[in-house]
């Protein structure tokens, strides 16, 4: 029952507190470790495709395994001192592995700036949560970027860590976060990371394969619960879920596009380079700032569905 209560408590902590700036966050430490490992390995290994592949593979092995070992040992030691301490640590880390409240807050900030008509401020706000270049985005482009981020991060920021913590508590959830953080920092297909980031990207693809598909199905159900188009979500997901270079990224994006009746994705600039990405969904209407709020409601609805279903399954397996 430890994992049951840790997951429930962690979910409630995230819903109530999000990620307070005064509380050290494991992902920040992971990012520092990735940067340090990258710097050391790039210096130590030959600057060739083979050398960069080897360096990237080393990071992709050391960080997840190290995270699992350190967090697992910490949870074990805390539980040995007192069961309540072990549970509290697991709750804290489970809460920090989830990003529902933070995602909703950041995307709502984008909506607020758009609602005020302050496009430069909206661009700055959306730049906090997307990887693309934002300085030349129109209001529709800013809205589209925010909606896409809510949809995609509903999978890797909520559903995936929730699934892994249900399977293995906080240590497994944070191990997943280590993999996801590696991908966000190294998994680019540009000159700098084409080889060094390849293992991180492939490992992230594998870790997200099942969660992203579960998240898409839950999004269809969430669309029905929130008054959006479940039929559209199902239809566009079935049609467009593979319209992305990543096997996972278009899963929830396509369901979201169909639920809202808008078109997402399409060409974008990353670090000054133009990427001709395919569009997802049909433009049944023009996207509007309130679609950010609609996407948030569906994200919260699918999060609650995942929690209830996951805890129910966990309870049945324990009893």
List each language-model region with its residue ranges.
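Glycine-rich phosphate/dinucleotide-binding loop and adjoining beta-alpha-beta core of small-molecule
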Residues: 184
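Hydrophobic alpha-helical transmembrane segments
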Residues: 1-175, 179, 187-319
